[in-house]
A protein has these predicted regions:
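Short linear sequence signals and composition-biased patches located at protein termini or domain-edge surfaces
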Residues: 134-214
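Short, glycine/small-hydrophobic-rich surface segments
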Residues: 35-36, 58-88
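Type IV pilin-like appendage domain
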Residues: 80-158, 197
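Aliphatic-rich helix starts adjacent to a transmembrane/signal segment
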Residues: 4-65, 213
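Aromatic-acidic/polar surface patches that form glycan- and anion
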Residues: 43, 80, 165-167
Length: 214
């Protein structure tokens, strides 16, 4: 199963989960508690799946099954900004493993309210673009996605990272927040008082193993 198929399945499951919360028919108090607890659980599960995908992709920055086709990992990062990054790697496009050909992978964060499902205006889509294919992304409840870049000497690089400084990137810190796409009522007597459960994750100094080749 390819990574894009996994993304689509995650998105479908998450949207179903949000809609399921609306159909609960238990008592008012129990329904409210259930909505909150399920919302928190969905946020955590969603965050776990997203982090798995990001860690997998980012750890392969500069990787190629045929090293001669990407001999210098220093040149693998093509663009680096606070909420977008483009780099070279060797992707598993058909579920059989990397094929030894260099691919480009581009992540970028869409605008608030573009997710299209649910009523949370803060939710965004994190797009993943493989080579020159159309942008693909799912409504996974992302509200914040921030990248911070460090040199080998732990100096922070200013974003957007200048073209001449891209080769200085040695590690990346990923910060990400997700929220419910559908609000849970806090009180039956005040239906307009709503809340969105949230979860936060930060990966400190993720470094591709391929940087060791420098």
């Amino acid at each position: 199963m390819g990574l894009q198929t996994i993304i689509d399945l995650i998105g479908s499951a998450v949207i179903f989960g949000w809609l399921f919360l609306i159909t609960i028919t238990a008592s008012s108090a129990n329904r409210e508690d259930f909505q909150v607890s399920q919302g928190e659980l969905l946020c955590q599960q969603n965050l776990v799946e997203l982090t798995k995908l990001l860690e997998y992709d980012f750890r392969k920055i500069g990787y190629c099954k045929e090293p001669d086709r990407l001999p210098n990992p220093t040149l693998a990062v093509l663009l680096a900004d606070s909420s977008r990054i483009k780099f070279l790697t060797d992707l598993d496009l058909d579920g059989t493993g990397p094929d030894g050909f260099v691919d480009s992978l581009y992540y970028y964060l869409g605008p608030p309210g573009a997710a299209g499902a649910g009523n949370n205006p803060r939710v965004r889509i994190l797009y993943r673009v493989v080579n020159n294919q159309p942008a693909a992304g799912s409504s996974l409840g992302i509200t914040n996605f921030r990248l911070t870049y460090y040199t080998r000497f732990n100096d922070t690089l200013v974003t957007p990272v200048a073209q001449a400084d891209l080769q200085k990137i040695f590690s990346i810190q990923i910060s990400m927040s997700v929220e419910n796409m559908i609000a849970s009522a806090v009180s039956e007597t005040a239906p307009l008082n709503t809340q969105y459960q949230s979860a936060f994750w930060q990966q400190r100094r993720l470094s591709s193993r391929n940087y060791q080749n420098r």
